[in-house]
Regions:
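Membrane-embedded alpha-helical bundles that constitute the cytochrome b-like, heme-associated redox core
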Residues: 1-193
């Protein structure tokens, strides 16, 4: 018989060395804040874009019901909300998140978002109301809407493929480590230059 102490074997699920709980991946709080705000605004823009398309265009299909409201204005307002978050997320991605941009599943959503915002800024909201569906900016905006949907799906697939549910859940974590509080964000950006 061996006199070595018996250590409990770690369970296969959620535990690390010596049976202690395994900590999942940690994402910087600034990334989580910018990513979360941008993601919510993108989702709102994408869904309202679907409603606007169904009401005013519908060449390739319509929603089965017409929702009341001025959806062009709602869509445009959400785009205005999205703009500063998208710019800040792009700045973050090009500085602190530069290494992550090497993965196409991370860079393509930003490019699609840039096309969506840029083409949206070129549009006149009265075009759709008056049936003017021939403008290049509108066609680019439709293409961007499709690309955003595909790019976000590819981004989610890439996250799940790379780190599974723990990585996806780490983006929803609301706790911040010491040195990663909102008061530390400016210092983090300066240090990374």
């Amino acid at each position: 018989m061996s006199s070595a102490p018996v250590r409990p074997s770690p369970s296969k699920e959620g535990s690390g060395k010596h049976g202690s709980p395994k900590k999942g991946p940690y994402q910087p709080s600034l990334l989580r804040a910018l990513h979360g705000c941008s993601a919510l605004a993108v989702l709102g823009c994408w869904l309202t874009g679907l409603v606007v398309y169904g009401r005013y265009d519908g060449r390739w299909g319509r929603l089965p019901l017409q929702l009341p409201g001025d959806w062009i204005d709602i869509h445009g307002s959400l785009g205005v909300v999205l703009l500063p978050f998208a710019v800040l997320l792009a700045v973050y991605a090009c500085t602190l998140g530069r290494r992550r941009l090497q993965r196409p599943s991370n860079s393509l959503p930003l490019l699609a978002l840039g096309l969506a915002i840029g083409s949206g800024k070129l549009m006149q909201e009265d075009w759709l109301r008056s049936g003017q569906l021939h403008h290049l900016a509108y066609h680019l905006h439709l293409l961007a809407w499709l690309l955003v949907g595909v790019a976000v799906a590819a981004h989610l697939w890439g996250v799940l493929r790379l780190g599974g549910w723990p990585l996806a859940q780490s983006m929803l974590n609301t706790t911040a480590r010491s040195g990663d509080q909102p008061s530390d964000w400016l210092r983090q950006l300066r240090r990374r230059r």
